A protein has these predicted regions:
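A short core secondary-structure module
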Residues: 267-325
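Flexible, small-/acidic-enriched active-site or ligand-binding loops
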Residues: 323-348
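C-terminal amphipathic alpha-helical interaction region
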Residues: 560-572, 577-845, 849-857
């Protein structure tokens, strides 16, 4: 018994040293002292005590530590790490980090999190949304754009140019708007809610392109030359990166620029002879200025460095009408935004056309990655959020309006399973947008966060829109100007593919970049492992390596405590009874992730980049933790209504459950099962801590989605909202609002109708009978007839001529004049004889005290 007590004391001491992060010497001396004391309790404890004493001495004595631990570790890790190409290095090095680093490191600082300023719109930004963006949306008809004009109208293009839609990111000194990241996101979302084609056309110049590159890297002369024109729309930009041989592997572009002398504007100057063939370039067919990525070579050393011939990827800016440049023809990417080719053979340009001048030769890939790190966090997530919001509004309305088997389709549990998913995913998308743009508004280029935003937002959009198609069925399949969902569905592949293909982003980039940017020691360790001066590197590595070990053991201690005894109760001060349990789970999972990530990095080393499924699961864990914190912050700044809490609860339950499942998927598939089993035992000793969201929660959220709830009201502020019954969106929305107003009357009438309470075969005959028997009043009959006609119109799909070129008029047999009451043939309801046979007696007796006199049994 004393032996067990002494062992427990030693283990607890070891845990406390790491949990409370004692210094190396303090921890070692404490461990030696406790080992000696434990030996007095039970001499058998020296079985563990002696190794701990020896290890403590090694840790305290630098020479011993270097000889016994550091040198062997340095040698083994140097051999295990594969060589890294300059392109890989630049991609992984690019950008900065933000809140995602706190979550990666396993000890999120909630005070820091709470102090992040929540994004809001300035007066100017709000005015632009309410006026210019609203006007633009009124000009757009996505069906006409898709199937007739194959482009925005000339009037629309002119409006976009005149009102500065192409210069949202450009500083005011050049005539731009200088809007915040949050404002850009809101603007793009609102445009996308009306037309994805218009949104993409406005998005690209404000994302990765000449404007962004010039802002950050251009010379003063280049900025003065191009930025005012880009702002006014006098210049239309595009950027050529991808080519037939290089899509996701854009670093392998075959396009070249060779340093040589040539003729330019009548002078013999040093420049570049360029050969390029670019594909899938948005806005290329109408561009006036082209950004190009190419590989720069200097075989003759004309730039001054005779030893350097291969400079790597470089970016330059060319006028589209420059000699030898061929722009066009168009591609057809499933949506009619301008997209095409850019080609050139033996095109000579002066060196000062390199973005940033010759000093930036070879720095193009890092420039692109850093600009992409910002743009991909705004543009495609904004489009995804808009798609989610419009699907929520339209499908929620449809699910309430559309009846099958005499019941609104949204009340069937099978439908509720997917509509609840639409609701929670839309809530997540909006929350995600707020936190990501909050980070971007802080400055910096958080590459990992924006890679998460692009991947998880577009994947969420894919699920939401697919669910919407399932619910709406034939109404969403039949194309035409009435279809509110199909064109969004067609655009999914574009969002999934561009600005970082989703498979690549999840399986390689998110955790690959995350480990470089978010781990406190890994990046510096890798630099030292690959340093040419091994002796100098070893000295630095010795200190850094022990900091890393201390970090790992601290996270192990935290993960153990949280896994066995529950997560830390640390949370922001604004946390309430609803949110505190979620913060506790995040604390637990964050510590578990830090330990799991170190296990993968330490044991797999360079093989981690080939274990893409494991890397994808690590990305899932990291991202779902970030998403959960985004939802919590969004909820904290929201109205906290019962409906909003339902949305937040389902979104949080899904995010954290998905993170947990990624943990267990990784443990089950890790190649070294013993190590995975130990980490699993430390982090999840009781098995899965979370259950999937309950069916009842899904039902509640699905029912809320069919109501005009507070979250739905908020979404209306973020999209182009209208109730025009002849509009593709307004048709469903106006019908939904009409049903909201008369639903008690409608439901009572339909229930009575289902029980055979009325004579006649049609709805109109039932109305006439109910009216003439006094079961309903003339005003109610008018309301029922009007809504029924509106309801029928809302579910109609378009019809076309045989060539599918022109839509044809639709017949709505329910559009009739309200029926009158034959008072002579049918006496008032109070004296009407009730129908027999167990059916409901329908009468409205205004003289009896009955709050619900419409149906009596």
């Amino acid at each position: 018994m004393l032996f067990i007590l002494s062992i427990v004391i030693l283990v607890f001491t070891l845990w406390a040293i790491f949990y409370f992060q004692l210094s190396r010497n303090s921890g070692a001396m404490t461990l030696i002292a406790v080992s000696i004391v434990s030996a007095f309790i039970s001499p058998w404890s020296l079985i563990l005590g002696i190794p701990l004493i020896v290890l403590s001495i090694i840790v305290m004595v630098d020479a011993l530590r270097m000889k016994i631990i550091t040198q062997p570790a340095y040698k083994a890790l140097s051999q295990a790490m594969p060589s890294m190409s300059s392109t890989e290095r630049e991609a992984l090095d690019a950008g900065t980090s933000w809140w995602e680093k706190e979550l990666f490191m396993g000890a999120p600082n909630w005070d820091t999190f709470e102090q992040y300023p929540y994004p809001t719109l300035s007066v100017e930004e709000q005015s632009f949304l309410d006026n210019e963006v609203e006007q633009l949306c009124n000009m757009l008809d996505e069906w006409e754009i898709h199937h007739k004009h194959k482009d925005l109208s000339p009037e629309t293009w002119q409006f976009i140019k005149t009102h500065g839609f192409l210069g949202l990111i450009i500083p005011k000194e050049y005539g731009g708007k200088a809007f915040s990241s949050f404002a850009q996101s809101r603007i793009m979302s609102k445009i996308a809610s009306r037309s994805l084609t218009a949104a993409v056309s406005c998005m690209v110049p404000n994302s990765l392109g000449p404007g962004e590159l010039l802002l950050h890297y251009g010379t003063d002369e280049q900025k003065k030359r191009y930025l005012p024109g880009l702002t006014k729309g006098e210049e239309i930009p595009c950027f050529g990166l991808t080519s037939p041989e290089a899509g996701s592997d854009a670093g392998a572009i075959p396009d070249t620029g060779v340093v040589c002398y040539g003729q330019f504007e009548g002078q013999h100057v040093l420049g570049l002879k360029m050969n390029f063939s670019k594909r899938w370039i948005t806005l290329a067919p109408i561009a006036t200025v082209i950004g190009l990525a190419f590989k720069l070579y200097d075989p003759e050393g004309l730039l001054g460095d005779k030893t350097k011939t291969d400079y790597g990827i470089t970016c330059a800016l060319l006028p589209a009408n420059h000699a030898g440049v061929k722009v066009g023809p168009r591609h057809h990417p499933g949506s009619p935004f301008m997209n095409g080719t850019v080609e050139g053979q033996d095109v000579f340009i002066p060196l000062d056309w390199i973005i940033g001048g010759v000093e930036n030769a070879g720095k193009g890939w890092r420039m692109l990655m850093e600009c992409l790190a910002v743009g991909r966090g705004i543009s495609l997530p904004a489009l995804s959020t808009a798609a989610g919001e419009m699907t929520y509004l339209n499908v929620g309305a449809f699910a309430r309006i559309r009846q099958q088997f005499k019941l609104s389709v949204g009340k069937f549990e099978g439908v509720q399973e997917v509509t609840s998913d639409i609701a929670s995913e839309t809530y997540m998308l909006e929350a995600f947008r707020y936190l990501v743009t909050c980070g971007l508004n802080q400055g910096g280029k958080p590459a990992v966060m924006t890679a998460m935003a692009k991947y998880y937002a577009t994947e969420s959009m894919r699920r939401v829109v697919n669910h919407g198609m399932d619910v709406v069925g034939g109404r969403a399949i039949q194309l035409g100007p009435r279809n509110f969902l199909a064109l969004t569905y067609q655009a999914i592949p574009v969002s999934i593919t561009v600005e970082g293909a989703n498979i690549l982003s999840r399986s390689l980039m998110i955790f690959g970049q995350g480990s470089m940017r978010c781990h406190p020691y890994l990046y510096e360790e890798l630099q030292l492992l690959q340093a040419p001066d091994k002796d100098a590197a070893l000295t630095q590595f010795n200190e850094l390596f022990y900091h890393h070990l201390g970090y790992t053991f601290n996270r192990t201690a935290r993960a153990f405590a949280f896994g066995w005894f529950g997560g830390s109760s640390d949370a922001p001060q604004q946390a309430d009874e609803f949110s505190r349990p979620y913060y506790k789970t995040i604390n637990h999972f964050s510590a578990a992730f830090a330990l799991t990530a170190d296990m993968c990095l330490g044991l797999l080393a360079g093989d981690i980049k080939r274990k893409e499924m494991l890397s994808g699961r690590l990305a899932d864990i990291h991202a779902q933790l970030f998403i959960a914190t985004a939802i919590l912050k969004y909820y904290a700044h929201g109205q906290k209504t019962a409906d909003e809490q339902l949305h937040a609860q389902l979104a949080l339950d899904k995010a954290l459950f998905n993170a947990q499942e990624a943990f267990f998927g990784l443990f089950n598939n890790f190649p070294m099962q013993l190590a995975a089993g130990v980490v699993k035992l430390i982090c999840f000793p009781w098995g899965r801590a979370l259950q999937p969201p309950s069916d009842q929660l899904k039902r509640d959220v699905a029912m809320s989605m069919m109501q005009d709830n507070a979250f739905r009201q908020q979404l209306k502020q973020h999209v182009f909202y209208n109730t025009d019954p002849d509009d593709v969106f307004g048709r469903m929305e106006s019908t939904f609002q009409s049903l909201t107003e008369i639903e008690p009357l409608w439901d009572r009438f339909k229930k009575a109708e289902a029980k055979g309470s009325f004579d006649g075969l049609s709805f109109v005959e039932h109305i006439a009978d109910a009216l003439n028997t006094g079961a309903i009043q003339p005003e109610e009959a008018s309301q029922l007839l009007s809504y029924n006609a509106q309801r029928f119109d809302s579910i109609l799909t378009d019809i076309f001529d045989m060539q599918l070129e022109q839509t044809l008029p639709l017949d709505n047999p329910h559009l009739i004049e309200p029926l009158g009451v034959d008072t002579e043939a049918h006496p008032p309801a109070a004296s009407a004889e009730p129908k027999t046979g167990g059916t409901a007696q329908l009468a409205t007796d205004h003289h009896k005290e009955d709050p619900e006199p419409f149906i009596r049994f």
